[in-house]
Amino acid sequence: MWYSIYCEDKKNSLDLRMKTRESHLEKLKLLLDQGRILIAGPCPAIDNEDPGEHGFTGSLIVAKFPSIQEAKEWAKNDPYYIAGVFESVTVKPFKKVFP
């Protein structure tokens, strides 16, 4: 089943986010290579794809997992979570309708 993983960043976490970015992307690439990512990316803090020093407010990942528990475990093992970038993480079942 698909699960949405919404991660809210801690304030002023941009430097930590950027230091941890490569390992975070490597973890996502494993899911991508397995065909398990529907969409993934950060949420800019301003209305611009490149927010610069304004940074990001969080991230959204919609990916396929065998269960919600496995989705939560995956999120807890994300390098951003481990490094302390995220204030909170919410995992919910997701039903794809379009496209």
Residue ranges and their predicted role:
Residues M1-P99:
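Conserved, structured core segments of small domains
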